[in-house]
Amino acid sequence: MSVKEEKVIRPIVHFPPSVWADQFLIFDDKQAEQANVEQVVNELREDVRKDLVSSLDVQTEHTNLLKLIDAIQRLGIAYHFEEEIEQALQHIYDTYGDDWKGRSPSLWFRILRQQGFYVSCDIFKNYKKEDGSFKESLTNDVEGLLELYEATYLRVQGEGVLDDALVFTRTCLEKIAKDLVHTNPTLSTYIQEALKQPLHKRLTRLEALRYIPMYEQQASHNESLLKLAKLGFNLLQSLHRKELSEVSRWWKGLDVPNNLPYARDRMVECYFWALGVYFEPKYSQARIFLAKVISLATVLDDTYDAYGTYEELKIFTEAIQRWSITCIDMLPEYLKLLYQGVLDIYIEMEEIMGKEGKAHHLSYAKESMKEFIRSYMMEAKWANEGYVPTAEEHMSVAFVSSGYSMLATTCFVGMGDIVTDEAFKWALTKPPIIKASCAIARLMDDIHSQKEEKERIHVASSVESYMKQYDVTEEHVLKVFNKKIEDAWKDITRESLVRKDIPMPLMMRVINLAQVMDVLYKHKDGFTNVGEELKDHIKSLLVHPIPI
């Protein structure tokens, strides 16, 4: 039944409807078949584990060990071997420090930095001539160029040799890709995909889909590894479909398209978002909760941006700050439904976490949601007053209204014993890695959505604030913002390397949040206006299994 309300003039926007309808509502659970597959997966996992452990014992095999770890990670099955990989890379780090003696220094550098080991980039100074230019011989090794290119994305501020290496490798690879279009189209396409999105910004499950057929074509591929990747992908896809069915039933119960028709109906895309943050089976409950939070955060965004009146939003903001069902009577009808929906998902998760003795973790998530709503209210106030904030004012609020500080805290809920009260408190202080992730989210969103938002009453975007304050063109601002985004990625890398008091799995959630933005907002707002690329991603991850 639809919720009725009085007629009020509103700054309504008509968003495209969902492209999925009820496609994911029903899940066909084939438990018997899955049990057989799980048994095979367990056997294959033991085979690969033996390969990992045996490679540790022979120093001359350390380059091959890195290549094995790289393949495991790119095939999307590293979650099976977290302890073994950590042990192997710690051994390599302890053995060599910054003085790597093996082949493939770019691979060594990237793999260790990805895992949180701060190895020096000085090794790449050997790639340059005395005049500072890169050696011509590097251009003859396409695989080496690609490895160096991928390694540059693990750089931090002040690593000029890697800044130079990125420019050099990109220039070389663009030419090579163009030259190979007709003679080797497969390699040309692979290079173009790498140039479009480097490994460090690519979601693990999407990379697995891309890499599995390539790995299969390698003459030296490990058959156990390949089979584990394929079977494991499909097994996880089944779990993810089951989760999405649960989230779909919850969304169907809210009936957002009818009860809150002004809002974007993007539940499936929100689940994809959560899947980008963590795909591993042990985070199933956390993923379901996060998908629901992102879905409602999208509705909240549209309520503040595109529908609610200023007075309604003030009342709703107060209700969220009080966080009590007794506040529901003070709200207009349509906001009662939304308010109840928000409270319900936190109550549900509180009950689940209570069984683990961690119900209090929800208090941190609630606090971050309250702050998130306060930032929306500040932007609504600016829009209501026609006030254009300074760039600094705007970003201080917009970092929070991006939703990423809230999501960074929320995504820790349900991750198990690795998450402590100290970790939540750390997240709420907005440490540099979370600030950098917020910057990426806000700047990428504003770059691609500001033109549409100018068509209605809306707070000035960060682009507009910057243009007005510094009297510069939009083109200039976009260059500045893209540079800020790249700097934010460097800050993320630095923090993942220097913060040893926060477990790497928690750091990875923040990194993954930034990766999702790069997928959804790389060239346009692919979340609001769902294009073929995102539809293909969702179908490949959640509809079509990999042929065995």
From Swiss-Prot:
Reactions the enzyme catalyzes: (2E,6E)-farnesyl diphosphate = (-)-(E)-beta-caryophyllene + diphosphate
Keyword GTP-binding: no
Binding positions (Mg(2+) 1): 301, 305
CDD domains, per the entry: Terpene_cyclase_plant_C1
Recorded effect of pH on activity: Optimum pH is 7.7.
Tissue: Highly expressed in stem epidermis, cortex and stele. Detected in leaves, petioles and inflorescences, but not in roots.
Annotated TM spans: none
Top-level EC class: lyase
Enzyme Commission numbers on file: 4.2.3.57
Pfam family, one: Terpene_synth_C
Keyword Cell membrane: no
Keywords, comma-separated and alphabetical: Lyase, Magnesium, Manganese, Metal-binding
Names of required cofactors: Mg(2+); Mn(2+)
Cofactor note: Binds 3 Mg(2+) or Mn(2+) ions per subunit.
InterPro entries for this protein: Isoprenoid_synthase_dom_sf (IPR008949), Terpene_cyclase-like_1_C (IPR034741), Terpene_cyclase_plant_C1 (IPR044814), Terpene_synth_N (IPR001906), Terpene_synth_N_sf (IPR036965), Terpene_synthase-like (IPR050148), Terpene_synthase_metal-bd (IPR005630), Terpenoid_cyclase/PrenylTrfase (IPR008930)
Positions bound to Mg(2+) 3: 445, 449, 453
Short motif (DDXXD motif): ranges: 301-305
GO biological process: diterpenoid biosynthetic process; sesquiterpene biosynthetic process
Coiled coil: none
Role this protein plays: Sesquiterpene synthase involved in the biosynthesis of beta-caryophyllene, a sesquiterpene with anti-inflammatory and anti-carcinogenic activities. Can use farnesyl diphosphate and (+)-chrysanthemyl diphosphate as substrates, but not geranylgeranyl diphosphate. Produces two irregular monoterpenes, yomogi alcohol and artemisia alcohol from (+)-chrysanthemyl diphosphate. Limited activity with geranyl diphosphate, leading to the production of limonene, terpinolene, beta-pinene, gamma-terpinene, alpha-terpinene and other minor products.
Record family assignment: Belongs to the terpene synthase family. Tpsa subfamily.
Complexes and interactors: Monomer.
PANTHER family for the chain: OS04G0344100 PROTEIN-RELATED, TERPENOID CYCLASES_PROTEIN PRENYLTRANSFERASE ALPHA-ALPHA TOROID-RELATED
This protein's domain notes: The Asp-Asp-Xaa-Xaa-Asp/Glu (DDXXD/E) motif is important for the catalytic activity, presumably through binding to Mg(2+).
UniProt-recorded name of the protein: Beta-caryophyllene synthase
Originating organism: Artemisia annua
